[in-house]
Amino acid sequence: MSTPSPQLLVAAAQRTLGMGKRKCPPRATCLHLAGEVLAVARGLKPAVLYDCNSAGVLALQSYLEELQGLGFLKPGLHILEIGENNLIVSPEYTCQHLEQTLLGTVAFVDVSCSQPHPSVLSLDQLPGLKSLIADIITRFQELLKGVSPGVSYSKLHSSDWNLCTLFGILLGYPVSYTFDLNHGEGNCLTMTPLRVFTAQISWLSGQPPVPLYSFSVPESLFPPLRNFLSAWEKELRTRFRAQNAFADLSISSEVVTLPAVAL
């Protein structure tokens, strides 16, 4: 796959994602998005959540098809709609990631507001989530049986799911927050020291790095979560070495304490 000029990538995004009453994404946002989409296509992350503006499924399909027409992407990416959110997904890499999740490679941190401190859970303690992951794997396996030249689309109905937990899994985080929906969407992370992990890569010369991951874990739980985080970093570095579109993978962390944490 070739890398078109930045001007062509920006034009493709503004032409498809800024139609009608939607404001055109600025140049930096367009390049940021193209880099994240390419990272999904190259297997560095299973999905990216589209949050640049209110563009819907049809606009995103047009955008991805334009990138294919520029020789920037191969066919195979998928748009997954969950609630009012759209994710651009690699069915192949998402299947691999979810299959590993069922084997216990992802940890869960219960931050329900009904408890005084965050606590670690395993997937076996979340049977409903385990069943949902298996269903999503089946859905993507069906997609992989025949890749069409266009950009496919599907919708997951999410009336009783914890979207925070589900998005954490789909976006490839090694640790995902969860909480009891029966107690509202509050959490017990207020003024709790959090270790924030950030992974980014270099792409276009003269442009800021492309963010791959940004997630946090309670600092008090860092020791029991260390193995999950180390395995995630090892896997990411392995995938990074297998591609040649990006350079300079950087993974860092810092501890922050916030008066409120929105999930």
Curated annotation (Swiss-Prot):
Against PANTHER family, the record matches this protein to:
UPF0739 PROTEIN C1ORF74
Family, as annotated: Belongs to the UPF0739 family.
Q: What is the protein name given in its UniProt record?
A: UPF0739 protein C1orf74 homolog
This protein's source sits in the domain of life called: Eukaryota
